[in-house]
Amino acid sequence: MTIANDPIVIVSAVRTPMGGFQGELKSLTAPQLGAAAIKAAVERAGIGADAVEEVLFGCVLSAGLGQAPARQAALGAGLDKSTRCTTLNKMCGSGMEATILAHDMLVAGSAEVVVAGGMESMSNSPYLLDRARSGYRMGHGRVLDHMFLDGLEDAYDKGRLMGTFAEDCAEANGFSREAQDAFAIASTTRAQQAIKDGSFKDEIVPLSVMVGKEQVLISNDEQPPKAKLDKIAALKPAFRDGGTVTAANSSSISDGAAALVLMRRSEAQQRGLKPLAVIHGHAAFADTPGLFPVAPVGAIKKLMTKTGWSLDEVELFEVNEAFAVVSLVTMSKLEIPHEKVNVHGGACALGHPIGASGARILVTLLSALRQKGLKRGVAAICIGGGEATAMAVECLY
């Protein structure tokens, strides 16, 4: 069968709660978070653990986790020892890239059932002892922060934080501090409402963690309820004196994981499964590394060309809020109304566990579409290094 007649479908989509930095999920490693998401995704798909042939999982801050973090997560989820596993690092796009590669693997006939997603425990990212391997002959040494070096800093302009490029984007495109704060407040308000009315309930697998000497069940995202909206306007710029980007209108450091089960529609039919959605296409875009905040615009444009969709036909968008300005510039350049974007809030409120976010926004997009009885959605994410990826899905009812 051709891909048009037998498309790739998503059978289940699950995420963990998003934990704050050094917060409720700090006792769990990235593979443990990934294992929880994978186990729940497989169970909700209605397949046996031995049915999964391949696991593709994103993880950016892998130093100190031990060999093959994706394999650890898969076996931790109870998958069969025969399951092949690959850990991916495409920065913030890792979780979505894992899903893209899972899609293409299924199209190629290399597997019949694949789990894709991403995981990150930013709380547990270690410090690195620079030059310790070769030795310190004399003078001062230094300790490097794995999270900053490999997650939050530009690789080309050494030591430059991602937030400074967000500042450049805001200035170049005329987004004021007030506009960015207003977006962050809307994101947080939406997330708080989603928690209050149970909109996240279907997409989250609760986690049991030790808090002090007690075992506690964590079923909600940690950070939105703690946000103090009245304090946002008073925050100092985080990246540049006199700048407009703050801790509130940026994504927060976070822990979490997300997983999706993919297969061909014919495979789902043979197994008696009811898919959540069809993947209609995916696209990637790359430009100058410092222009990563604008890259989702290019990825979405390419995606519309590949799918034959128009932007007006897309009913909901998830555009990862690495910084508020990323979503703002995407909405502005593509003329997308805010009412269609991140309807349950985004990373400014929930957090941005780097390797997981690309999968997390897909999970949240599918959940929001189904709750509202809508069909077509697009998820897009900017990626450090000047890239972005985007994916188009259509819900099945």
Residue ranges and their predicted role:
Residues 1-30, 229-294, 298, 305-306, ...:
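Condensing-enzyme catalytic core mediating Claisen C-C bond formation in acyl metabolism
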Residues 2-65, 69-77, 84, 168-177, ...:
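Conserved active-site "lid/cap" helical segment
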Residues 14-16, 27-35, 44, 179-270, ...:
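N-terminal extracellular/periplasmic Venus flytrap/periplasmic-binding protein-like
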Residues 59-114, 156-162, 226-252, 333-360, ...:
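Conserved catalytic cysteine-centered active-site region
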Residues 88-120, 170-199, 259-266, 331, ...:
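Active-site-proximal alpha-helical scaffold in enzymes
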Residues 113-169:
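Flexible glycine-/small-residue-enriched beta->alpha junction loops
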Residues 165-167, 203, 210, 280-349:
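Active-site pocket-lining segment
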